[in-house]
């Protein structure tokens, strides 16, 4: 229900000549409800309608979804002849008060700053190694332990699980949206459509698995994982963090520096000879989904970087890929993971094969990534031992 007292307080603040305000519900539909606002003023009666949206289904699941609908309404109602005009977009705050958020020309996010070395640096160094060293393994243990922990938070919602499946294929930031940013000639429209169709078929297979819904990061790729300098447990000396510029897979910029609150909130993982600390950036596209989203966001990069450097998946890259999956499954018992990753790998494969993000990739390297995507989609489950067969 709408907060009538807070709404009346907002109206009396915005319309100075109000004598009396009456609010009554007009009715409800499949998307939401409408409320009639009648204001008695010195110049007569003025009438308005407040519209609400239901909080689950039709892509209106999160408050930000509903805000986006209303902000677009406010901008565009006035641009169509004979259409009623929007007056404002109202937000109900934590304390119950109502304030205006309408009328902005653009919107920005103010956030904390973070420091460190993003995991892309480690992946680049893998090309110089035949096998992982102790710090490499500790970082993988730290990441898989972290994911196992956040993924243990479950939610019972068929709607939100199905939305994550739908968004993975159709969202503007996911498979179809990424393909739409490809320069013409990179991949034919038919080839793009074929990958999309296969991914849609996977949605039908995964819909019954809605019990998998869990808390996720949503964009757990190397550019969003910033490690602090690995510190020996025998020493309190730590080298200064190195600062790096923006990275290609991120939806935003790397933000530098760190507040005391961010330092306190850092995840500390790892046992044995080193403490491994990291901080995360750019959680994306909602708090709930399938753990496969986070797992593939990271592991596609072992495959991608190995293709860039070796033309196949081998050496420290294959070791990292195998260790990441095996450690995570050992921690969670989620053997089903291998049977659900395919459409998520399709999305992440489209990202790393994108010439806009990685213009230095050769045509042959892109072809290997697309073969991987198609062959994983064609298999009934992802098999680590077949990773190079998927490139063929």
Each model region followed by its residue ranges:
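A glycine-centered beta->alpha junction motif in the catalytic cores
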Residues: 55-56, 113-132, 175-184, 304-305, ...
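Active-site activation/catalytic loop segments of kinase-like enzymes and analogous catalytic loops
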Residues: 285-332, 346-363
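Active-site catalytic-loop/activation-segment of kinase and kinase-like phosphoryl-transfer enzymes
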Residues: 107, 112-114, 148, 155, ...
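Intrinsic disorder/low-complexity segments
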Residues: 229-275
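Active-site acidic catalytic loop and adjacent metal/ATP-binding pocket
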Residues: 26-40, 44-45, 49, 150, ...
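Regulatory N- and C-terminal appendages and interdomain linkers associated
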Residues: 1-30, 36-47, 57, 61-69, ...
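All-alpha amphipathic helical-bundle segments outside canonical DNA-binding/catalytic cores
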Residues: 333-345
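Conserved ATP-binding subdomain of kinase catalytic cores across diverse folds
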Residues: 33, 40, 47-168
